[in-house]
UniProtKB/Swiss-Prot annotation:
It is an enzyme of class 2 (transferase). SMART domains: BATS, Elp3. This is Biotin synthase. The gene is bioB. Binds 1 [4Fe-4S] cluster. The cluster is coordinated with 3 cysteines and an exchangeable S-adenosyl-L-methionine. It holds the Pfam family Radical_SAM. Keywords: 2Fe-2S, 4Fe-4S, Biotin biosynthesis, Iron, Iron-sulfur, Metal-binding, S-adenosyl-L-methionine, Transferase.
Length: 326
Protein backbone atom coordinates (compact mmCIF):
# COMPACT_ATOMS: atom_id res chain seq x y z
CA UNK A 1 0.00 0.00 0.00
CA UNK A 2 3.01 2.30 0.27
CA UNK A 3 2.95 2.85 -3.49
CA UNK A 4 -0.66 4.07 -3.62
CA UNK A 5 0.00 6.39 -0.66
CA UNK A 6 3.00 7.93 -2.41
CA UNK A 7 1.16 8.14 -5.73
CA UNK A 8 -1.67 9.97 -3.98
CA UNK A 9 0.76 12.41 -2.40
CA UNK A 10 2.39 13.17 -5.75
CA UNK A 11 -0.98 13.62 -7.44
CA UNK A 12 -2.25 16.04 -4.79
CA UNK A 13 0.90 18.15 -4.95
CA UNK A 14 0.52 18.23 -8.73
CA UNK A 15 -2.96 19.72 -8.35
CA UNK A 16 -5.17 16.64 -8.68
CA UNK A 17 -8.05 15.86 -6.33
CA UNK A 18 -8.51 12.52 -4.61
CA UNK A 19 -11.16 10.37 -6.27
CA UNK A 20 -13.61 8.12 -4.44
CA UNK A 21 -12.08 4.87 -5.70
CA UNK A 22 -8.58 5.75 -4.49
CA UNK A 23 -9.94 6.97 -1.15
CA UNK A 24 -11.63 3.60 -0.71
CA UNK A 25 -8.35 1.80 -1.33
CA UNK A 26 -6.52 4.03 1.15
CA UNK A 27 -9.20 3.28 3.73
CA UNK A 28 -8.14 -0.38 3.67
CA UNK A 29 -4.57 0.23 4.81
CA UNK A 30 -3.53 -1.29 8.13
CA UNK A 31 -0.55 -1.46 10.47
CA UNK A 32 2.47 0.77 9.96
CA UNK A 33 1.07 2.04 6.64
CA UNK A 34 -1.33 4.15 8.71
CA UNK A 35 1.64 6.14 10.01
CA UNK A 36 2.81 6.73 6.44
CA UNK A 37 -0.68 7.95 5.53
CA UNK A 38 -0.68 10.29 8.54
CA UNK A 39 2.68 11.72 7.53
CA UNK A 40 1.48 12.38 4.00
CA UNK A 41 -1.65 14.06 5.39
CA UNK A 42 0.55 16.29 7.55
CA UNK A 43 2.58 17.37 4.53
CA UNK A 44 -0.57 18.04 2.54
CA UNK A 45 -1.87 20.21 5.38
CA UNK A 46 1.40 22.11 5.60
CA UNK A 47 1.35 22.72 1.83
CA UNK A 48 -2.31 23.70 1.37
CA UNK A 49 -3.27 24.97 4.83
CA UNK A 50 -3.14 28.34 6.55
CA UNK A 51 -0.01 27.52 8.56
CA UNK A 52 -1.55 28.20 11.96
CA UNK A 53 -3.94 26.30 14.21
CA UNK A 54 -7.34 27.95 14.66
CA UNK A 55 -9.09 27.66 18.05
CA UNK A 56 -12.84 28.05 18.49
CA UNK A 57 -15.07 27.97 21.56
CA UNK A 58 -18.77 27.64 22.28
CA UNK A 59 -21.41 28.36 24.88
CA UNK A 60 -24.43 26.09 25.33
CA UNK A 61 -26.77 29.07 25.11
CA UNK A 62 -30.04 27.12 25.21
CA UNK A 63 -30.12 23.56 26.50
CA UNK A 64 -32.34 20.49 26.37
CA UNK A 65 -35.97 19.79 25.41
CA UNK A 66 -35.04 19.40 21.74
CA UNK A 67 -37.80 18.16 19.44
CA UNK A 68 -35.36 16.20 17.24
CA UNK A 69 -34.48 12.55 17.88
CA UNK A 70 -30.75 12.46 17.05
CA UNK A 71 -29.65 9.22 18.68
CA UNK A 72 -26.31 10.55 19.93
CA UNK A 73 -27.66 13.67 21.63
CA UNK A 74 -28.30 14.10 25.35
CA UNK A 75 -30.48 17.16 24.69
CA UNK A 76 -33.21 15.32 22.78
CA UNK A 77 -36.61 15.23 24.49
CA UNK A 78 -37.02 11.75 23.00
CA UNK A 79 -34.30 10.31 25.26
CA UNK A 80 -33.78 9.89 29.00
CA UNK A 81 -30.38 11.52 29.47
CA UNK A 82 -29.80 13.61 32.55
CA UNK A 83 -29.11 17.07 31.14
CA UNK A 84 -29.80 20.61 32.25
CA UNK A 85 -32.74 22.25 30.49
CA UNK A 86 -32.96 26.02 30.19
CA UNK A 87 -34.01 28.74 27.77
CA UNK A 88 -31.65 31.33 26.32
CA UNK A 89 -28.97 32.30 28.82
CA UNK A 90 -28.73 35.83 30.15
CA UNK A 91 -26.84 38.03 27.65
CA UNK A 92 -24.38 39.18 30.31
CA UNK A 93 -23.49 35.54 31.07
CA UNK A 94 -22.88 34.82 27.38
CA UNK A 95 -20.75 37.92 26.85
CA UNK A 96 -18.82 37.11 30.04
CA UNK A 97 -18.12 33.61 28.79
CA UNK A 98 -16.92 35.01 25.46
CA UNK A 99 -14.53 37.39 27.19
CA UNK A 100 -13.06 34.54 29.24
CA UNK A 101 -12.54 32.39 26.16
CA UNK A 102 -10.94 35.30 24.29
CA UNK A 103 -8.57 35.94 27.20
CA UNK A 104 -7.61 32.27 27.28
CA UNK A 105 -6.67 32.22 23.60
CA UNK A 106 -9.75 31.29 21.55
CA UNK A 107 -10.13 32.99 18.17
CA UNK A 108 -13.78 32.19 17.52
CA UNK A 109 -16.90 32.05 19.68
CA UNK A 110 -20.29 30.52 18.95
CA UNK A 111 -23.69 30.37 20.56
CA UNK A 112 -25.13 26.86 20.25
CA UNK A 113 -28.83 26.36 20.91
CA UNK A 114 -30.89 23.21 21.24
CA UNK A 115 -33.95 22.68 19.07
CA UNK A 116 -34.78 22.17 15.42
CA UNK A 117 -34.27 25.84 14.65
CA UNK A 118 -35.56 29.27 15.68
CA UNK A 119 -38.60 31.38 14.91
CA UNK A 120 -38.05 35.00 13.94
CA UNK A 121 -39.16 36.05 17.43
CA UNK A 122 -36.70 33.65 19.08
CA UNK A 123 -33.92 34.96 16.88
CA UNK A 124 -34.29 38.60 17.97
CA UNK A 125 -32.53 38.33 21.38
CA UNK A 126 -29.82 36.21 19.80
CA UNK A 127 -29.13 38.93 17.24
CA UNK A 128 -28.83 41.47 20.05
CA UNK A 129 -26.27 39.27 21.80
CA UNK A 130 -24.19 38.98 18.63
CA UNK A 131 -24.26 42.74 18.18
CA UNK A 132 -22.88 43.09 21.72
CA UNK A 133 -20.20 40.48 21.07
CA UNK A 134 -19.14 42.33 17.93
CA UNK A 135 -18.82 45.57 19.90
CA UNK A 136 -17.26 44.19 23.07
CA UNK A 137 -14.84 41.50 21.83
CA UNK A 138 -12.42 40.95 18.98
CA UNK A 139 -13.56 37.36 18.47
CA UNK A 140 -14.66 36.02 15.10
CA UNK A 141 -18.32 35.15 15.62
CA UNK A 142 -19.96 31.85 14.72
CA UNK A 143 -23.47 30.50 15.25
CA UNK A 144 -25.04 27.06 15.57
CA UNK A 145 -28.80 27.56 15.79
CA UNK A 146 -30.20 24.65 13.80
CA UNK A 147 -32.30 24.77 10.64
CA UNK A 148 -32.80 28.40 9.56
CA UNK A 149 -33.92 30.05 6.35
CA UNK A 150 -31.85 32.39 4.21
CA UNK A 151 -33.53 35.55 5.49
CA UNK A 152 -32.74 34.60 9.09
CA UNK A 153 -29.18 33.73 8.16
CA UNK A 154 -28.73 37.09 6.43
CA UNK A 155 -29.79 38.82 9.64
CA UNK A 156 -27.16 36.84 11.54
CA UNK A 157 -24.53 37.92 9.03
CA UNK A 158 -25.61 41.54 9.43
CA UNK A 159 -25.23 41.16 13.22
CA UNK A 160 -21.60 40.12 12.79
CA UNK A 161 -21.70 36.33 12.40
CA UNK A 162 -19.14 35.22 9.81
CA UNK A 163 -19.41 31.43 10.13
CA UNK A 164 -22.46 29.19 10.48
CA UNK A 165 -22.08 25.73 11.95
CA UNK A 166 -24.43 23.00 10.73
CA UNK A 167 -23.15 19.43 10.69
CA UNK A 168 -24.11 16.76 8.21
CA UNK A 169 -23.36 14.38 11.15
CA UNK A 170 -22.99 11.30 8.92
CA UNK A 171 -23.14 10.04 5.35
CA UNK A 172 -26.41 10.25 3.45
CA UNK A 173 -26.72 6.45 3.65
CA UNK A 174 -26.20 6.29 7.42
CA UNK A 175 -28.06 9.45 8.46
CA UNK A 176 -31.55 7.84 8.72
CA UNK A 177 -30.14 5.47 11.33
CA UNK A 178 -29.31 8.37 13.65
CA UNK A 179 -32.13 10.85 12.99
CA UNK A 180 -35.70 10.54 11.68
CA UNK A 181 -37.26 13.91 12.60
CA UNK A 182 -35.59 15.84 9.80
CA UNK A 183 -33.88 14.88 6.57
CA UNK A 184 -30.36 15.03 5.19
CA UNK A 185 -31.61 17.33 2.46
CA UNK A 186 -32.93 19.78 5.05
CA UNK A 187 -29.44 19.98 6.51
CA UNK A 188 -27.94 20.57 3.08
CA UNK A 189 -30.55 23.27 2.38
CA UNK A 190 -29.51 25.13 5.53
CA UNK A 191 -25.85 24.90 4.53
CA UNK A 192 -26.58 26.32 1.09
CA UNK A 193 -28.75 29.07 2.60
CA UNK A 194 -25.92 30.10 4.95
CA UNK A 195 -23.52 30.23 2.01
CA UNK A 196 -26.01 32.30 0.03
CA UNK A 197 -26.21 34.67 3.01
CA UNK A 198 -22.47 35.26 2.72
CA UNK A 199 -21.23 33.14 5.61
CA UNK A 200 -18.53 30.51 5.66
CA UNK A 201 -20.02 27.17 6.72
CA UNK A 202 -18.51 24.86 9.33
CA UNK A 203 -19.86 21.35 8.79
CA UNK A 204 -18.67 17.88 9.69
CA UNK A 205 -19.95 15.04 11.77
CA UNK A 206 -19.46 12.40 14.40
CA UNK A 207 -17.29 9.30 14.12
CA UNK A 208 -18.00 6.02 15.93
CA UNK A 209 -21.81 5.97 15.81
CA UNK A 210 -21.82 2.55 14.16
CA UNK A 211 -20.97 3.77 10.66
CA UNK A 212 -18.40 2.16 8.38
CA UNK A 213 -15.23 3.86 7.19
CA UNK A 214 -16.91 4.07 3.77
CA UNK A 215 -19.65 6.15 5.40
CA UNK A 216 -17.00 8.49 6.78
CA UNK A 217 -15.41 8.81 3.34
CA UNK A 218 -18.79 9.44 1.69
CA UNK A 219 -19.46 12.27 4.15
CA UNK A 220 -16.08 13.82 3.32
CA UNK A 221 -16.90 13.79 -0.39
CA UNK A 222 -20.32 15.32 0.33
CA UNK A 223 -18.58 18.08 2.30
CA UNK A 224 -16.18 18.66 -0.59
CA UNK A 225 -19.05 18.94 -3.05
CA UNK A 226 -20.67 21.54 -0.77
CA UNK A 227 -17.47 23.60 -0.66
CA UNK A 228 -17.09 23.33 3.11
CA UNK A 229 -14.02 25.14 4.44
CA UNK A 230 -14.19 24.15 8.12
CA UNK A 231 -14.83 20.51 9.04
CA UNK A 232 -15.35 19.66 12.72
CA UNK A 233 -14.65 16.06 13.59
CA UNK A 234 -16.41 14.83 16.71
CA UNK A 235 -16.00 11.36 18.15
CA UNK A 236 -18.96 9.85 19.93
CA UNK A 237 -19.04 10.31 23.68
CA UNK A 238 -21.65 7.67 24.62
CA UNK A 239 -23.98 9.34 27.14
CA UNK A 240 -26.22 7.39 29.49
CA UNK A 241 -29.88 7.71 28.57
CA UNK A 242 -29.26 8.08 24.83
CA UNK A 243 -29.79 5.23 22.33
CA UNK A 244 -26.03 5.14 21.67
CA UNK A 245 -24.99 4.88 25.32
CA UNK A 246 -23.60 1.37 24.73
CA UNK A 247 -22.06 2.00 21.32
CA UNK A 248 -18.45 0.68 21.17
CA UNK A 249 -15.87 3.24 20.10
CA UNK A 250 -13.69 2.62 17.08
CA UNK A 251 -9.97 2.17 17.85
CA UNK A 252 -7.75 5.27 18.02
CA UNK A 253 -5.75 4.26 14.93
CA UNK A 254 -8.98 3.97 12.93
CA UNK A 255 -9.87 7.50 14.01
CA UNK A 256 -6.43 8.78 13.00
CA UNK A 257 -6.63 7.03 9.64
CA UNK A 258 -10.03 8.65 9.03
CA UNK A 259 -8.68 12.10 9.93
CA UNK A 260 -5.78 11.63 7.51
CA UNK A 261 -8.22 10.64 4.76
CA UNK A 262 -10.28 13.76 5.42
CA UNK A 263 -7.17 15.87 4.94
CA UNK A 264 -6.41 14.17 1.61
CA UNK A 265 -10.00 14.56 0.41
CA UNK A 266 -10.24 18.16 1.68
CA UNK A 267 -6.66 19.45 1.36
CA UNK A 268 -7.34 23.15 1.98
CA UNK A 269 -10.20 22.92 4.51
CA UNK A 270 -9.79 23.41 8.23
CA UNK A 271 -9.96 19.97 9.85
CA UNK A 272 -11.21 20.86 13.32
CA UNK A 273 -10.92 18.44 16.24
CA UNK A 274 -14.00 18.78 18.42
CA UNK A 275 -15.90 16.82 21.07
CA UNK A 276 -15.03 13.33 22.24
CA UNK A 277 -11.33 13.36 21.35
CA UNK A 278 -10.19 13.04 24.96
CA UNK A 279 -12.02 9.78 25.70
CA UNK A 280 -11.73 8.14 22.29
CA UNK A 281 -8.08 8.90 21.56
CA UNK A 282 -6.83 8.62 25.14
CA UNK A 283 -3.03 9.06 25.14
CA UNK A 284 -3.02 9.66 21.36
CA UNK A 285 -5.08 12.85 21.35
CA UNK A 286 -2.19 14.99 20.11
CA UNK A 287 -1.76 12.79 17.02
CA UNK A 288 -4.64 14.23 14.94
CA UNK A 289 -2.39 17.26 14.51
CA UNK A 290 0.26 14.96 13.06
CA UNK A 291 -2.42 13.38 10.83
CA UNK A 292 -3.54 16.61 9.17
CA UNK A 293 -5.81 18.46 11.62
CA UNK A 294 -5.24 22.21 11.93
CA UNK A 295 -8.02 23.50 14.18
CA UNK A 296 -9.69 22.63 17.45
CA UNK A 297 -12.75 23.31 19.56
CA UNK A 298 -11.38 24.22 22.99
CA UNK A 299 -12.93 24.50 26.43
CA UNK A 300 -16.18 22.81 27.41
CA UNK A 301 -18.49 21.20 24.85
CA UNK A 302 -22.29 21.17 24.95
CA UNK A 303 -23.05 18.68 27.71
CA UNK A 304 -19.55 17.37 28.48
CA UNK A 305 -16.28 18.95 29.61
CA UNK A 306 -13.10 19.21 27.58
CA UNK A 307 -9.53 19.99 28.56
CA UNK A 308 -8.52 23.48 29.59
CA UNK A 309 -7.61 25.89 26.81
CA UNK A 310 -4.13 26.22 28.29
CA UNK A 311 -3.61 22.45 28.07
CA UNK A 312 -4.57 22.39 24.39
CA UNK A 313 -2.39 25.38 23.56
CA UNK A 314 0.56 23.76 25.34
CA UNK A 315 -0.05 20.51 23.44
CA UNK A 316 0.01 22.36 20.13
CA UNK A 317 3.16 24.24 21.05
CA UNK A 318 4.82 21.00 22.13
CA UNK A 319 4.11 19.72 18.60
CA UNK A 320 5.86 22.77 17.15
CA UNK A 321 2.65 24.20 15.70
CA UNK A 322 1.77 27.88 15.49
CA UNK A 323 -1.49 29.07 17.00
CA UNK A 324 -3.41 32.00 15.53
CA UNK A 325 -2.85 35.32 17.32
CA UNK A 326 -0.57 33.79 19.99
Amino acid sequence: MQSIIRQTEAALFAGAVLDRETAGKLARIEGSDIYTLMDVARRVRDHFGAGKVDLCSIVNAKSGACSEDCRFCAQSAHHQACVKTYDLLDPDAIVGRARVMEAEGAHRFSLVTSGRGMSDAELEPVLAIYERLRRETKLSLCASLGILNEAQLRRLAEAGVTMYHHNLEASRRFFPQICTTHSYDERIATIRAAQAAGMVVCSGGIFSMGETIDDRIDMAFELRELGIRSVPINILNPIAGTPLEGQPLIPPLEILKSIALYRLILPSARIRMAGGREGALRDLQSLPFIAGADAALVGSYLTTSGRTVAEDIQMLRDLGLNVNNL
